[in-house]
Curated annotation (Swiss-Prot):
A Pfam family recorded for this sequence: AAA_lid_NAV1
Modification Asymmetric dimethylarginine occurs at: 498
Gene: CTTNBP2
Basic and acidic residues compositional bias, start-end: 1645-1663
Segments passing through the bilayer: none
Bias-annotated ranges (Polar residues): 411-422, 583-593, 1582-1599
Organism: Colobus guereza
UniProt name for this protein: Cortactin-binding protein 2
Primary location class: cytoplasm
ANK repeat copies, ranges: 709-739, 743-772, 776-805, 809-838, 842-871, 912-942
Keyword hit for Phosphoprotein: yes
Any one Gene Ontology molecular-function term assigned to this protein's record: protein phosphatase 2A binding
Length: 1663
């Protein structure tokens, strides 16, 4: 049993293990649990549970049998029947070794293994089950989500269908609209075609009209010619008539003698007989009839010779005249003036000639008791063409005078006879205009009077010129073109006539007649004296309103309706003449040329006077010749148009027409008693004021119907500005000076309304009520302020008028002044302390009124004008100082003064809810809106009653302004980081430059801000690198991102907004506007990439050297390791080298190498041993035994020109080229030890030479280095100064580039041209040592408005730098030959007299032609600074008189500018092509001849030398003692520089073209010498001047001598062999610009052959 049990145990224990293992292996191999479905998983789970149950049963069974098995194993081993068990026992019991494994498997261990495996399987199955459950849950959730997504998909699909339907409808609508719009477009196109057709028609019509106009002009010219011809005929006829008149006078004298004889005979006959007297009377009557006939003939003749009349000295008996036509002058409100004290005709008239022809036979017509009427002038002056009357009847009238011809009584200053027609509104007063008539006249009024009344040569209103006799009238055509001018001058003349007319008439001689002058403008009155005529009155039309003249303090009132004049002749019975007043009235619209002369024969003749509809006033005029006062012409009415808020002025509705009857008293009898009226108390006042005593009754009660009382007369006098009448009325007792008419207008109101300051002063001194208001509540101050009479306003304010008085509508004087744009009145009222916030009934304030008119000045005054302290008011300039510029271009007044008006007043709304900003924005008054926006309290979002903001009602311009209202202006600056110390030549380079100001609005996004910054930088780079003066606006259209200097937005290293770093494209949470406000960023700084980043952008911007060239230099250093920079002194070599070293150092450090810069300054004492120590100590020279280090060394050798290159670098040339241990070089140290060294591969050697070219032995060093030549006439030096100074100007103007015509631009251009012209002249003089780089000119001061600062700086630069260098170079050249080896020329310590003269001449020529030429300062101002320049006062005649008579035969007299560098690659100085082997001698001749024909630099001395060789030249010992050929060449070149261009017309030396000069030194061997001149400088087109006579002679002589033949060309300096080839063709391009020639040269100058031997002769070109 035991054996069976023991033997069966393994089988029972293996069974479940094998089953479980097989199941697991099958599960692993056949399927994956993750891929089972739910049902399969359930089945698998049931299988697992069954296995677990079976396992539990096995375990229980084994436990039950365990005891048996234990006993069996323990005690059954001694069974001898089983040897296997015995062997097992022995094995286990033997040796006690625990590590021995049993021979057979223990069932218990098998069971334990099975149990462990089952546990593992259980754990794995439970884990898989949990994973399956979680996946099941996820699956369920995904199914739910899928269902939700499907439902949402269905909804979206439905919505999509709906949207598609809607879109279809929209598309259909759009298609319809497109069709409609296309139809409209077609219609508009058709309309446009029609309009264009109409436009073409209009153009054709316009052209036709122009042609007609030209034809009319030609016609008028022809008519004028005809008139001139007729006038000449008239002159001839006048002379004939004068001769006839002389004959008649002689005949009359004979007749008088005959009469005397007859009288004597009669007396004798009386004695002899009593029956003969009856026969003498008919004879006498017959004689008188003869005289009458002769005078009648004169009347007819007078009409035909109207235009030519001389000054007449009347005889004493010329008082008798025929009836004549007497014009009634339309002088409104002008006082009448009687005859002059010297007689009825002023014989001292210097301004105007009397219109009276010489007549001698009219003294017997009228008796001497009749008032003397001067004869009508022999003028036929007709303002509007010929009159319509026929030949006058000598018995009835003389030829009727036109409206403005000379009056019959007295000659007026404004009435020049013949053609100087008087202004129609002028009064009739004395022509003399002497001081006796105007004792108290204002000189300004007198001057104005003479201006408008015509002096001896001033044109009158018809365009004629008042000249000394004989003068002529112009044609009617020319008069018609001057109507407007005539009206304007009439108005001013009328205004001046009131004050220029005498107020106190001098007593005239008895018999001088009084004169009546009435009428208005433009009606023209005519008065004719007839034998049996009755006065007749016609009513005229209202006159036009003249322009308002608020500026004249004494401006009279506007013209008024005319006074009707009835001249009563009832008391002139003994004269037999009557006065008929005929007023020919024309409406204002009718032109003056429409007036015509009415013949008096057509006037009705009645026995009784025809009275006008209104009562007349009988003016009894005294015969004493006293001046008639202004009462005779005082008129009321015709007020100017009422201003807004003001009603019509006083008496405008019922303007009084005052008919006046002027009675001409007979002879000189006193006034009859019947004509006198009571009231003699007024006679003194009347007489004292210049009135005739006979006017006194008029003032009391005279006439059929008097005026409406004294107060009305007072108002009329005040309204018209009649100070005389007003003062007289104010002296009366009991007169109510505060009387008001129906409208409530007082006399003070009328005077203030019309701007009569004197009347206002009189009324105020008479204590008139200053605040009396009319029926609308307007006071005199309101009226004066509305009309702009600031003097009246000032006077009323001084008399304490109520400045805040409000009318019935609430209008204050300030409001009315603002409403009518009266700036002076506003200023006076504000200074008086008026209230600015008074509102009208409509809610309008003065601010509303000022904005409504769009007057910026008024608004500025209201907002900024303060009440001055201590009575000092702002002057007008202060109140308007600064333009309110949003761009901040000028300093605005609010930067100095703050607004004085509160925010409530600015934001006050009227009845409609509109503020002042609403009004300004709606009317498009951008300037007014801008000023309002400057006020900090403005509320632009305030809405009106229609819920509209200011932006809603604004125009487009104003909307743009409002959108920029709160825009921040942040200056944008460019910084280049730290500027190196001045040792590197960067002391004039600026660290920061302001390029523009950015507008940052509230709605500006960060993207817009980034684009603005990038665009501003791009525009700035393009502007400073352009050829001309560009503004930022000019370059915005340029789409290129890179500028000419290579900078762009990519050159930016970093940007700081205030102190916050920012990069392009970066965005913050806040908008740029909020960000700037919050961080208080005052500027935006752009830092360019510099050497620290391994870039050269900052170096480019600081030095203005193009980035491409700097990168090229850096590439040369990195590639060749040995580079030397050379150029004229001041070419920034040190700065360039140091910046390249910094950039190279940082690049090497970025690559992981350590780098060091070693700098050494070379001087004359720097030895080769010191240089060796420098190389060794800096680890640049390494011993052969030593291993190289990874450290990079950059060695800079500065100022190599101070030492000899060949001596200093000779031993280092070979190892520098071959840097390796294979080519070592042995150097001996100072201690005597020698050692082999080699140059490290990582060593960079850079040097600087301040010399334009190498010479002598230094050329041996040239091939071992890479050379960078910084030529002054090539890039980068050529444009560096221009770019630098332009950037300086832009920075000075805060980013705004000024216009090219700005004085700053001109002075900067001048400084630039000085540098270029100076170098051009120095190069031409062959003194390359004196050439200057741009460094010295970088410090040019830019001070706007002070060009003198730049000139003073230039004088210091000239005296301190330029002149000493030029002096040294000239002495070096003129004293000794150039010495090879050291490279420098030494001048004599004690120059000779001739050398000193050459130096002075050179300095003088350079100063005048290169420095002072082109200076924009005025000549007088420049002369003051010329003395500051030393060397400018040398007589250039010494130079021009010098001649090269001591030159050796066969040598050339001219010499050239030099460049001796054989490795030069750019032919800036050279010509495009060189020697051609196939050039024939004949070709050279032709070219030479053509060149000489165009030679502009030929001098007179050369011409003389060509003609006379040595015979006519000056002895050198007498003038200049010059010892060498170079010295003679120098003087020759100075001659050519100052010849052919006069000192007064200095042109640019830079334009001197390549010359080919010939000198006849030997008989048939003329020498050709070519001068290489600079072709880079700009030239002016007006520089090409014709040859003078001397030059022409020289050309012809040279031509004849050239044909003799060409032997050879000799040159002492290295010159391209084919220099001769292109001389003539270059001269043909005399008018082309230098830029064009530069391009041609640069394109063709790559291949050059240079002669390096100084004394080698060039063979003939055809050899």
């Amino acid at each position: 049993m035991a054996t069976d049990g023991a033997s069966c145990e393994p089988d029972l224990s293996r069974a479940p293990e094998d089953a479980a293992g097989a199941a697991a292996e099958a599960a692993k191999k056949e399927f994956d649990v993750d891929t089972l479905s739910k049902s399969e998983l359930r089945m698998l789970l049931s299988v697992m549970e069954g296995e677990l149950e079976a396992r539990d049963l096995v375990i229980e069974a084994l436990r039950a049998r365990r005891k048996e098995v234990f006993i069996q194993e323990r005690y059954g081993r001694f069974n001898l029947n089983d040897p296997f068990l015995a062997l097992q026992r022995d094995y286990e019991a033997g040796a006690g070794d625990k590590e021995k494994k049993p021979v057979c498997t223990n069932p218990l261990s098998i069971l334990e293994a099975v149990m462990a495996h089952c546990k593992k399987m259980q754990e794995r199955m439970s884990a898989q089950l949990a994973a399956a459950e979680s996946r099941q849950k996820k699956l369920e959730m995904e199914k739910l989500q899928l269902q939700a997504l499907e439902q949402e998909h269905k909804k979206l699909a439905a919505r999509l269908e709906e949207e598609r339907g809607k879109n279809k409808q929209v598309v259909l609508m759009l298609v319809k609209e497109c069709k409609q719009l296309s139809g409209k477009v077609i219609e508009e196109a058709q309309k446009l075609e029609d309009i264009m057709a109409k436009l073409e028609e209009e153009k054709k019509k316009t052209n036709e009209l122009e042609e007609e106009l030209s034809a009319e002009k030609r016609r008028s010219t022809e008519m004028e010619a005809q008139m001139e011809k007729q006038l000449s005929e008239f002159d001839t006829e006048r002379e004939q008539l004068r001769a006839k008149l002389n004959r008649e006078e002689a005949h009359t004298t004979d007749l008088k003698e005959e009469i005397d004889k007859m009288k004597k005979m009669i007396e004798q006959l009386k004695r002899g007989s009593d029956s003969k007297p009856s026969l003498s009377l008919p004879r006498k009557t017959k004689d008188r009839r003869l005289v009458s006939i002769s005078v009648g003939t004169e009347g007819t003749v007078t009409r035909s010779v109207a235009c030519q009349t001389d000054l007449v000295t009347e005889s004493a008996d010329h008082v008798k005249k025929l009836p004549l036509t007497m014009p009634v002058k339309p002088s409104t409100g002008s006082p009448l003036v009687s005859a002059n004290a010297k007689g009825s005709v002023c014989t001292s008239a210097t301004m105007a000639r009397p219109g009276i022809d010489r007549q001698a036979s009219h003294g017997d017509l009228i008796g001497s008791s009749v008032p003397a009427f001067p004869p009508p002038s022999a003028n036929r002056i007709e303002e509007n063409g010929p009159s319509t009357d026929s030949t006058p009847d000598p018995t009835s009238s003389t030829p009727p005078l036109p409206s403005n011809a000379a009056p019959p009584t007295t000659q007026t200053p404004g009435i020049a006879p013949q053609n100087s027609q008087a202004p129609p509104m002028h009064s009739l007063h004395s022509p003399c205009a002497n001081a006796s008539l105007h004792p108290g006249l204002n000189p300004r009024i007198q001057a104005a009077r003479f201006r408008f009344q015509g002096n001896a040569n001033d044109p009158d209103q018809n365009g004629n010129t008042t000249q000394s006799p004989p003068s002529r009238d112009m044609s009617p055509t020319s008069r018609e073109n001057l109507v407007a001018k005539q009206l304007a001058r009439n108005t001013v003349t009328q205004a001046l006539s009131r004050f220029t007319s005498p107020q106190a008439g001098a007593p005239s001689r008895p018999g001088a007649p009084p004169t009546g002058d009435v009428g208005t403008h433009p009606p023209v009155g005519r008065t004719s004296l007839k034998t049996h005529g009755v006065a007749r009155v016609d009513r005229g039309n209202p006159p036009p309103i003249p322009p308002k003249k608020p500026g004249l303090s004494q401006t009279p009132s506007p013209p008024h309706p005319q006074l009707k004049v009835i001249i009563d002749s009832s008391r002139a019975s003994n004269t037999g003449a009557k006065v008929d007043n005929k007023t020919v009235a024309s409406p204002p619209s009718s032109l003056p040329q429409g007036n015509r002369v009415i013949n008096e024969d057509n006037l009705p003749k009645s026995s009784s006077p025809q009275l006008p509809p209104k009562p007349s006033i009988d003016l009894t005029v005294a015969p004493a010749g006293c001046a008639v006062s202004a009462l005779a012409t005082s008129q009321v009415g015709a007020w100017p148009a009422a201003t807004p808020g003001l009603n019509q002025p006083a008496c405008s509705d019922s303007s009084l027409v005052i008919p006046t009857t002027i009675a001409f008293c007979s002879s000189i009898n006193p006034v009859s008693a019947s004509s006198c009226r009571p009231g003699a108390s007024d006679s003194l006042l009347v007489t004292a004021s210049g009135w005739s005593p006979s006017l006194t009754p008029l003032l009391m009660s005279g006439g059929p119907a008097p005026l409406a009382g004294r107060p009305t007369l007072l108002q009329q006098a005040a309204a018209q500005g009649n100070v005389t009448l007003l003062s007289m009325l104010l002296n009366e007792e009991g007169l109510d000076i505060n009387y008001s008419c129906e409208d409530g207008h007082s006399a003070l109101y009328s005077a203030a309304k019309n701007g009569h300051t004197d009347c206002v002063r009189l009324l105020l001194s008479a204590e008139a009520q200053i605040n009396a208001a009319d029926k609308n509540g307007f006071t005199p101050l309101c009226a004066a302020a509305a009309q702009g009479h600031f003097e009246c306003v000032e006077l009323l304010i001084a008399y304490d008028a109520n400045i805040n008085h409000a009318a019935d509508g609430g209008q204050t004087p300030l409001y009315l002044a603002c409403k009518n744009e009266n700036k002076e009145c506003i200023k006076l009222l504000l200074e008086a302390g008026t209230n600015r916030s008074v509102k009208t009934t409509d809610g309008w304030t003065p601010v509303h009124a000022a904005v409504d008119t769009g007057n910026v000045d008024s608004l500025k005054l209201l907002m900024y004008h303060r009440i001055p302290a201590c009575g000092n008011s702002f002057n007008e300039e202060e109140s308007e100082s600064g333009v309110f510029d949003l761009d901040g271009g000028e300093e605005s007044p609010e930067g100095i003064f703050k607004p004085v008006v509160p925010a409530d007043l600015i934001n006050h709304a009227n009845r409609e809810g509109w503020t002042a900003a609403h009004i300004a924005a709606s009317k498009g008054f951008k300037n007014c809106l801008e000023i309002l926006c400057r006020h900090g309290g403005l509320e632009p979002e305030r809405r009106d009653k229609c819920n509209r903001t200011v932006h809603d009602v604004a125009t487009d311009d104003c909307k743009h302004l409002l959108e920029n209202l709160n825009a921040l202006k942040i200056p944008l600056r460019i910084s280049v980081g730290e500027i190196e110390p001045s040792d590197y030549g960067s002391d004039d380079l600026e660290c920061e430059n302001t390029i523009c100001a950015l507008n940052i609005r509230k709605q500006t996004s960060w993207d817009d801000f980034s684009k603005a910054v990038s665009q501003a930088l791009t525009n700035h780079f393009q502007a400073i690198s352009s050829d001309g003066w560009w503004s930022l606006e000019d370059v915005t259209c340029n789409n290129t991102t890179d500028s000419n200097i290579g900078l762009s937005a990519r050159s930016i290293r970093s940007i700081t907004l205030g102190n916050v770093p920012w990069s392009v494209g970066q965005s913050f949470t806040q908008s740029p506007w909020d960000f700037m406000r919050k961080n208080k960023a005052e500027h935006i700084t752009v830092l360019l990439s510099g050497p620290q980043e391994g870039c050269l952008s900052s170096v480019t911007y600081a030095s203005m050297i193009p980035l491409q060239m700097m990168q090229n230099y850096l590439r040369l250093v990195e590639q060749y390791h040995n580079v030397i920079f050379h150029g004229p002194e001041g070419s920034l070599q040190d700065y360039i080298v140091h910046q390249l070293a910094l950039c190279l150092k940082h690049r090497q450090m970025a690559a992981g190498f350590s780098c060091e810069i070693v700098r050494a300054e070379i001087d004359a004492g720097f030895s080769k041993e010191q240089l060796l120590d420098l190389f060794i100590s800096s680890a640049c020279l390494i011993p052969v035994k030593q291993s190289p280090s990874k450290k990079k060394i950059i060695i800079i050798l500065e100022n190599l020109e101070k030492s000899s290159l060949s001596e200093l670098l000779r031993d280092f040339l070979a190892p520098l080229e071959n840097r390796s241990t294979e080519s070592p070089c042995t150097f001996q140290k100072g201690n005597g030890m020698s050692e082999c060294y080699y140059f490290h591969e990582n060593c960079f050697l850079m040097g600087t030479i301040a010399k334009a070219c190498l010479q002598g032995s230094d050329l041996l060093v040239q091939q071992h280095f890479r050379w960078v030549q910084l030529r002054w006439d090539g890039e980068p030096m050529q444009g560096l100064l221009q770019r630098f100074l332009r950037r300086k100007v832009v920075n000075k103007f805060k980013g705004q580039a000024p216009s090219p015509c700005d004085p700053v631009c001109k002075i900067v251009d001048w400084a630039l041209s000085v540098w270029r012209q100076l170098n051009s002249c120095l190069a031409r003089l062959g003194t390359p040592e004196a050439l200057l780089g741009p460094k010295y000119f970088l410090s040019c001061p830019v001070v706007p408005g002070h060009a003198q600062v730049t000139v003073k700086w230039m004088s210091k630069l000239w005296n301190g730098v330029i002149a000493p260098r030029v002096q040294e170079a000239i002495l070096s050249r003129a004293s000794v030959k150039r010495q090879p080896g050291f490279g420098q020329t030494t001048a004599k310590r004690h120059p000779s007299q001739g050398q000193q003269a050459v130096v002075k001449a050179a300095l003088s020529i350079l100063l005048n032609k290169a420095v002072l030429h082109g200076c924009p300062l005025p000549r007088a101002e420049l002369d003051q600074h010329t003395a500051d320049f030393k060397g400018g006062s040398f007589p250039l005649s010494i130079v021009s008189s010098y001649n090269s008579c001591n030159k050796k035969k066969g040598e050339s007299g001219a010499w050239r500018k030099v460049n001796t560098s054989p490795r030069r690659k750019s032919g800036r100085f050279s010509l495009p092509t060189w020697n051609k082997p196939d050039l024939s001698t004949e070709g050279i001749k032709n070219k030479t001849i053509s060149q000489l024909n165009y030679n502009r630099n030929a001098s007179l001395s050369k011409q003389k030398s060509l003609e006379n060789d040595l015979s006519l030249t000056l002895n050198l010992d007498q003038r200049l003692s010059l010892g060498s050929d170079d010295e003679a060449d120098l003087v020759k070149e100075l001659q050519s520089m100052c010849s052919s261009k006069s000192e007064s017309d200095i042109s640019k030396i830079a334009d001197s073209r390549d010359d080919l000069r010939m000198f006849d030194s030997s008989g048939n061997n003329p020498l050709l010498s070519a001068t290489i001149n600079n072709l880079r400088m700009p030239v002016s087109q007006k520089e090409v001047s014709p040859l003078s006579s001397h030059q022409t002679t020289e050309c012809s002589n040279s031509k004849s001598k050239t044909e003799l033949g060409v032997s050879r060309v000799k040159s002492f300096l290295p010159v391209p062999r084919s220099k001769v080839t292109l001389c003539s063709q270059n001269t043909k391009r005399s008018s082309s610009s230098s830029n064009t020639r530069q391009i041609e040269i640069n394109n063709n100058s790559k291949k050059e052959n240079w002669n390096l031997h100084k004394n080698e002769h060039l063979d003939k070109p055809n050899k």
